[in-house]
Structure formats: C-alpha cells, structure tokens
Amino acid sequence: MHLSDDKHGVRADGYACVEMTFNGSVNNRQIGHTILHINRFDEDYVLPLPDVQVRGLLAACFYPEITGSYRIVSSSGYSSRITFSGAGLVRGARNRFEASVFHQKAPETHLYEISGVWSESWVIKDGKTGEILEIYQVDAPENGPAQMELEPIENQDPWESRRAWKDTIEQLQAGNLRAAAAAKHEVEAAQRLLREQEKDRGEEWRPLLFQSHPGASHQVFQDLTRGTQWTLSDIRTKGVWRLDNNLLAGLQKPYRPTHTSMQ
C-alpha cells in the first residue's frame, strides 16, 4: 500500500498479510504495519493494522468491530495507546474505543485523552485538566471525505483495481451478494490459472511497483519499536514490501502488455 500527498508532504507505506478464521464471527488478523512520514517535521510514525471482526452473521445484521489494544509510536518521542472494546454478548456499545497520547519518557502522564465511538463521534480532552478540547462528529459536513478524482472505468488499465473488480463492485452495490461472490471467484480463478501457467514456464510473477526487502534493512521500524513487544514478522509476509519509486516514475499503460487481470 502506498499513499502520498506531495503538496502537503505526507507519505504512507504499508503492507499486510491477512489471516481469517470463523467462530460465529469472521475474524481478520492483520500482520504488517504502515510507516507514515511527515516532511514538515521530518517525523516517522509506525501505525499498527488492527484486527477486525465481522459480527452479526447469525442475526443477518453484519457490522465491523475492531478488537484489541494498539500503540502508535513516533520519532518525536510521543506515542498513543488505543484500546477497542466493542459490544459483547451481554452489554456494551458497538465500535467503542479509548485512547491517550503521552511522551515515551512519561507513559502514565496523559497529554490528551480520547474516547467515543469510532463510527459516530468522540471527545478529545486535556489529559491534565479533563477539559473538553474538541468533539468530533464523523457525519458532520466539514468532516466529509475529500472528493476522489478517478479516470473513467473505460480509460483505466485492466490491472487497476476498480476496473479489475468492476463486476464485483457493481453486484455489491446492487445488493446481489451471490452474483458478487461469483464475479469475485472468476477474477481469483483467472489469477490462480495465470500463476500455474507461469510456474509451468519457469517464470516468477513479480509485483508491478512493489519490492520485498529483508526485515533487517527496515531501519525505521527497528528504531521506533525498540523496547516494545512489536515484532516485524517479515518471514510470514515474505519480507518488507515497499514502493519502488523508479518503477513508479517509469510506469506507462498498458501496465502488463501481455496479460489482463482475466487472462
């Protein structure tokens, strides 16, 4: 994953390996992380990828729930601790969380405290005085998402995600889950067949823009997580994945001239 805003000097690079299990809920465990860099302050932040559950399957009322406790660590010396505690079988509200911001030298001295429901609203307080500094409403007009500017589907490369998953997206938007699953399976089956054909020819499939690096070379992660229980798990993710800027600079359509996502 790569996100960047050259105008504001913000960049994020991350990757994940997802493990799924089922025990009445769909459990998604994410192995990986994201590094956020802010040019203005020359700061790096290590962001965790939280575990997510899809609950309500038995009641046919699906909703997501983030679970567990996490830390965001920065090169500035400041950190945050976030604990998600959603609805249980007996009591509790959906999507609840509590968080605090502190300096790593004084983890018990909270500079800010945040609590609320991440899908609705939360309150930010001064950690020393308890004064409410801000109330954030997710659905407030001023907090709406920025408008996305996308090329028309017909102008996109067959490997761009919205075109590759066009049929699946359309069926999901129409509420046709069975048709969406069939469309999803068609793309996945085509990709598995391509991998088998490449293996038979002695070829190795390579990502278009990302390259894998040894975990020992990921110095930012090693520096920021030193002294914590955070592990890289680079063996399970087949290395640390980063965008290759040179490949991005030379990218031209068609991205893979000899293949589409379906053949």
Residue ranges of each PLM-predicted region?
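Extended acidic, Ser/Thr- and Pro-enriched interaction/regulatory segments
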Residues: 1-263
